[in-house]
Amino acid sequence: MKKILLYIILFLSGIDGAWALPIEKEGMSIYSPSLKQEVSYSIILPEGYEHSDTEYPVLYMFHGIGGDYTSWLEYGNVARVMDKMIKEGKIQPFIMVIPDGYLSYYSDTYDGSSLYETFFIKELVPYIDNNYRTRKDINGRSIIGFSMGGFGALSVSLRNRHLFGSVVALSPSIRTEKQYIEEEPQKEWDS
C-alpha cells in the first residue's frame, strides 16, 4: 500500500517514475572506414541492464528521410513504449540501436560512393555485439524501418538473412536509385 501511495504522490507531483526508465544514450558515435566519417547513433538499454549479465536481443531501427538517430526517440517515444511493454509483460527486454542513416537508404550505392550497408553489416553490428551484451544468433537481431528506413530494413535483411531473424517495414519507400538521382531529393531538404 505504501508503494502505491508513493507512486501516486510522485505521479501527481510530475515525477512519473523516470528513474526506472531504460537507459537512453543519444549522440554516441563510431568512426566508419567504409563511409570515411563518424556515424552517430542512439542506444536504449533495458532497465536493469547495468546490474545483470543477461545477453539481450537487439532491434535496429532505421529512420525515414529527414530524420536522424534521435527521430524514433523524439517522435516515436520508443524508450517509454519499450519500458511500458516490458513492465506489462508483453515483450521481453531488448536493446534498441538507432543509427543515423542520412539520405543513404541504408544501402551501398551502385558506384561505391556511399557504402552504408557495408558500414552497417561489417562495422556497426559487430561493434554493438562487441561492446554490449547482445544475443549474437539470428533470432537475437531484428530490423524495423519507416519510409526510407523501411526500404533499408527490407533490403539489408534480405541480403543478410543469416544475421536477422525478423524485419518490419513501415510504409517502405520502394523506389529505385535512378528515380532518386533524377529527382534530386536533397534539393528539397536543403531549401
Model-predicted regions and their roles:
Residues 19-191:
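Non-catalytic cap/lid and distal C-terminal segments of serine-dependent acyl enzymes
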